A protein has these predicted regions:
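Positively charged n-region of N-terminal signal peptides that target proteins for export
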Residues: 1-4
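C-terminal motif of bacterial Sec signal peptides marking the signal peptidase cleavage site
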Residues: 13-16
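N-terminal targeting sequences that direct proteins away from the cytosol to non-cytosolic compartments
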Residues: 18-85, 163-169, 175-210
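Conserved polar/disulfide-associated segments of primarily extracytoplasmic proteins
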Residues: 73-184
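Structural detector for short beta-strands of small beta-barrel domains
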Residues: 211-226, 268-270
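OB-fold (S1/OB) nucleic-acid-binding surfaces
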Residues: 226-245
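Flexible glycine-rich surface loops and low-complexity tracts that mediate binding to linear polymers
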Residues: 255-278
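OB-fold/S1-family single-stranded nucleic acid-binding modules
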Residues: 275-304
Length: 304
């Protein structure tokens, strides 16, 4: 299992919640109306609840000017300004069947699965109809070894990275409305930035304001231009870098540090932040917030 599924500690979030420079955006456009109310649980200081719809999911999540939770094609991620890439919180897993047995077989096919770390699925209460929740736990001799280790120190992750230990929580959910796949949910050790009881499988259209899209197109950076035109579109967007300088750094490497508006090919992970009303961005129809630079002119970003 990939290392981006690490336990999430949200202590000190408010320290990092400073407004990004140059963001003239108003409040993000609302998602489609639903009959559900925002969670009763109070958001963290500096955050507010909003509805997220995309990637076959809809749920309530907290967002601030610096940190937010977004849907994507694989599930959901947390993004933070000045981080090079998103941190995964939820992941769809194709099972090729139904029920917990199919889920175990699907996990055994995942990269990094170690058959020596024997595991079993334990059903728990999902707290809502049409949803089954399962927790992956160590089994057999592996369980005995883990139990001995857990008596001495915290072990947050077991079972090849998919199971629980004695610190934090993670589980799988099966939806009646989404047969043939399961959703892995990473809770961590503290109350998450999303409301786990609101997670629903859906066929609704992705909300471009709350869904991280991967777009290919043409990027230009100059003295008065930061633009991106997606393939197959005639719309030129202003781009705002949220990757801690990765976008401009990679552009500079290709142009020798000359920001002269040269067109380069790029693949970016972005959300649509709507129209801004100040600066050069105001001349564009909308603004794309860049949360990851996948590649520029065929050169892929180094994993960090």
């Amino acid at each position: 299992m990939k290392s981006y599924f690490l336990p999430i500690l949200f202590m000190g979030l408010t320290i990092a919640c400073q407004p990004p420079k140059g963001n003239g955006s108003s409040t993000p456009a609302p998602t489609e109306k639903t009959s559900e109310k925002a969670p009763q649980r109070a958001p963290y200081e500096g955050f507010e609840w909003r509805k997220v719809t995309g990637g076959g999911l809809t749920f309530w999540a907290q967002h601030s000017k610096n940190i937010t939770v977004l849907a994507d094609a694989e599930g959901a991620v947390m993004v933070r300004n000045n981080n090079a890439r998103p941190h995964r919180l939820m992941q769809w897993i194709k099972m090729g069947g139904a029920g917990p047995d199919a889920l175990l077989k699907a996990l055994a096919r995942q990269p990094g699965w170690d058959a020596r770390q024997t595991a079993r699925l334990e059903k728990t209460d999902a707290g809502r109809p049409g949803v089954e929740r399962y927790v992956l736990k160590p089994d057999g001799e592996y369980a005995k070894r883990i139990q001995d280790s857990m008596s001495h120190y915290p072990i947050p992750i077991t079972c090849s990275g998919w199971g629980v230990g004695n610190s934090g929580m993670r589980y799988f959910e099966l939806f009646d409305s989404a047969p043939g796949k399961a959703l892995f949910v990473e809770i961590g050790q503290d109350a998450p930035l999303f409301d786990e009881s609101s997670i629903t499988a859906t066929t609704a259209t992705d909300d471009k304001h709350t869904t991280l899209q991967t777009l290919q197109g043409t990027l230009r950076i100059g003295h008065e231009v930061r633009s991106f035109t997606p393939d197959g579109s005639s719309t030129e967007y202003w781009v705002a870098d949220r990757t801690g300088g990765q976008l401009e750094n990679q552009y500079d490497r290709l142009t020798g540090g000359k920001k002269n508006g040269k067109s380069v090919r790029a693949t970016l992970k972005v959300t649509d932040d709507g129209k801004w009303d100040d600066g050069f961005a105001a001349e564009y129809e909308s603004v794309l917030l860049v949360y990851e630079v996948v590649e520029i002119n065929g050169q892929r970003s180094a994993k960090q």
